[in-house]
Amino acid sequence: MINSLLEEESTAFAQVVRGIAISSDDYLKNDNIPKVNNNNNNNNNNNNNSNSNNNSSSNDYFNGRYNLVHSSVSIPSFDNFNFNSINSNNGNGNNSNSNSNSNSNSNSNSNSNSNSNSRDEENERLRSEYKKIIKNNTSKLELTRSKSRILVINSNSGEEEEEEEEVKTPTEVDSDNNNNNNGSINKTNKKLKNHGNIVLSKSKSFIDTIDAMELVESCDDLFKQKKILLKMLISENFFQSNQLDQKKLSTFMKSVVDIELMGVPSNILRSSQFKSLYLDYYRELFQNALNVTNLKLGENNKVFGGGSDNNNNPLAIYQKPIKKEGSFLIDSSFFSNFYQYQQLQQYQFLQQQQQQQQQQQKALPSSTFGNILRYQREFKEISKLGSGGFGSVYLSEYVLDGHKYAIKKVNFSISNNQSPTNASSKIEKVVREVVALAKLDHINILRYHNAWLELDPKNNKPRSSSFSSVEGSLGTGNNDNDESDDSFFEDQDEDEDEDEDEDDVSNSNFSDSIKFKGGFKKSSCSNNSISSNLKKKRNDKKYPFKRNLSISFSLNDSVTNTNSQEYSISEYFEKFNLTNNSESDESEIEESDSDEIYSESESEESESEESESDESEESESDSDNIDFENENIKEMIKALTISKSMIPFVKPIKKKKGKIYNPSSGSGASSGSGNSSSIGDSDSSEGNKPKGLTLSTKQLSNSQLIGINNLNNNNNNRNNNNNNNNRNNDKNSNSNNLRLKYTVYIQTQYCEGKTLRDLLENPDFKNNSKTTILSLFKQIITGVNYIHSMGMIHRDLKPANLFLSSGVIKIGDFGLVKDITATTPSTTPLTNNTPSTTPIDTTPTSSANTIPISTPPTSTITPTISVSPSKPLSSSLSSTAATTHLNSSLGCTISSSSSTTTATATTSTTPFMFYNSISVNTVGVGTLTYASPEQLSNKGVFGGGGYTNTWYTNKTDIYSCGIILFEMIVGGFETQFERTTHIKNLKNGILPSWFTSKHPEESNLILRMIDINPDNRPTSDQILSELLPILIEASERDIDHFDYEKLDQQTLISIIKKKDLEIASLKKLLQNTGNNNK
């Protein structure tokens, strides 16, 4: 029985929300619309068939036209629906409505024919009254800027357009939806495009916003079909004096759910599957209301990102919990009319599940990022296998197949104001390992399975400090403080020193020159050299490096004491300088359990997850700061001295005044101190003396100066008298600097035999025969040769990256791999005036090393040389020097009879080198103990006239293999100090006397492999095909018995063939001896 208080408008709106509302055009013009049944409770059984037929017709029409979400659920009739809870302010038609209801009740006892006629008359009357309501309400439909503004979605083009403010009829409003493009609307739309569009205007409370979201989301189908009704619904029925009427809206929403569930059989309502699907549908519908309906919160409401601070954040609406109890928006009272107890019980259960899921994941909705938390869903993490500068590796079980895999997690972050070039370069450095592994397929290469990218939602926030442009590392930087997860934005520190705002440098450029977080590792070295007093004075504080045209470190004045002293650390740079194999105290570094040096990838992208424990609860935004409490000063100096990203090569920068800035003289520093200056801003106008750590530049070359590369015009034009407006602008720009953190997951083969490092540390390894050791080394060279044949350089070969699986060596950890086939030179290297004197070999080119490569442009060498098996290499070359260097570096020989080659045989040219496309100065790449001199030196590759530039070949891997071979033959060292000492001497070309006397041929090969001149090193193909077989054959002659089980298949086949030849020779000898006896 329809309640006597039901008003015509409430009936129309109830139909609208269910998705069965007829558009105003249909009501005004179309007479063939199926009629809505409004039967009475007292209908007798004679009317069942007619009711069923009418409902079926109506359902087919509405379901087919509007493509309803719950198409399997019949459109309910209103026979048993109670509209007690719906209120309305419109008084039009109240009496007529009451009369119609009473008429309908009076006709309930009629026969079936009279009932049918009564229904038709009632429906016709409702339609007529609804037309009047629409026409009456259009006169009140004037939405001004002081009230709520609705942006509508054009269902055809998907463009956002704003309704006109003038009063129109429904037909006029619908026809003019696409023609309202005045200047102010365009300006408003353009401004709102970056906010995920808009939601309701000013509502005072949090509950108001939620109810409004429920309302407009439930009217989604209406919103797309007929906008005028939604305007009426919001402006005339639920807003009074521009404020939302919570009571009316709440009762309306209850009726929405009642109508939704009406007519659904009780057995379906009781089923857990239906309740789960129903609640999930509404939960997702309401949670994404802001993003779907294009309504905007007022500036005074900051619940979902409103206000000046969070206006530019398109994802802020997902970070705030909609309700403390969970994310469900349907209250338990909604089900009071339909099995309240069962529904409420199921709702509470799902609510608890949602709470647990939010606590575990703390993630954005999966609809925003499809791969989010894939690792947690599909893998069961067992243990941590190890960690390094490029990330951490975990042993995980895939739930689908039950197999174990090694999952490498590499974290990186991208800022929204980062230049596309820098962002692309960072992504390339992270993804290059995946690209390389996907290309490689070899028995001696770690097998690659899969890789994917996930967003780390709880760490996505803007950088609040003025140092926000300095990119963090690949560290996770996870903070266990739950409070930091509640907001996608973090408020800027109001007490931040204003001087930092003046020290702003270009975000995109400065991020290339200095990368701090993750650039330093914890070490076991003694920590008492410099920082003991510093720790006592400044315990539990962060000391950000400040920006300036300066050459030293300065502690921020805002967090340091006024009586801070200067600490000179220049002598440590000389001590730790490893650029030319000097007498550096390498033993101290080697004993630190950290062979790693931080390359262009590591300092920008990588950080071990062990750093999570070092971060305080407030430090989630402190990726720009160095904690002197937790970090080791020596490690910091070592990283600054060696890492390319920390010590970029600096070309002279031309100043505006016409002077050339020479970094070595320090003339460009604002402090004007000849040999020493501060990274902190030393404001000369205030006469402030630079405070904090100071780095002397007396013994530093131009390429070792810190933080002065890539300075842009913003820094040159900066003055010391910035006003408060500029500071405020800087803060606003910093608050909009959204930083998204991602994690790359790389799924590879898990080797249970651990690594070659574990094997070397086992005392029993010394008991292996030389043949067994050389057989293992042969597998390493085989894998390296395959990598080189694919046009790649590993650049980080070491025992820890050589994995063992059933006695088979597998090369892994391709975090520093360089695909030299995909690079292009962009900078001309320094010229070497000494021609190469290496003889030209005329043997055919080795196909194993025929790879497309690039050469720096010079006057006598073609800028690009493509080497292919089908084309003679000599036809692509125009210089004997280039041909000669290519012979020696690639192991391929060139036959050339061209006159050009002869004519240019004595011409001074640059040696042909591989070019690293990421940076000309690719120094500090790899592992300190095993990296070649050209990798460590900022001077570059050793040539005929000394070092040229940072161009090097794949022979840098041969250098690493030489050190590995030395360790394998020695069989491990007793102490770390002994290992460090011997490797240090080896790098200087010195082998122990006992080693050379016991292993003369191996000693000769090792010294060739670690030659400081890459031209003198053999190629992997030469070692594999020529040099190593000789050593293996000699070892077989020297040893009568060895363990055949530890030999590889090729070595065993070779031994069998030799044994077969010996047996055949003995048989023949025996046969000849028998014939002679006869």
Swiss-Prot record:
The active site is at residue 796. Residues 480-505, 583-627 have a biased composition (Acidic residues). Residues 379-1031 form the Protein kinase domain. Its EC number is 2.7.11.1. Residues 31-61, 89-125, 154-190, 460-511, 579-627, 657-737, 823-867 are annotated as: Disordered. Residues 37-59, 89-117, 177-187, 664-687, 709-737 have a biased composition (Low complexity). This is Probable serine/threonine-protein kinase DDB_G0268642. It comes from Dictyostelium discoideum (Social amoeba). The lineage of its organism: Eukaryota, Amoebozoa, Evosea, Eumycetozoa, Dictyostelia.
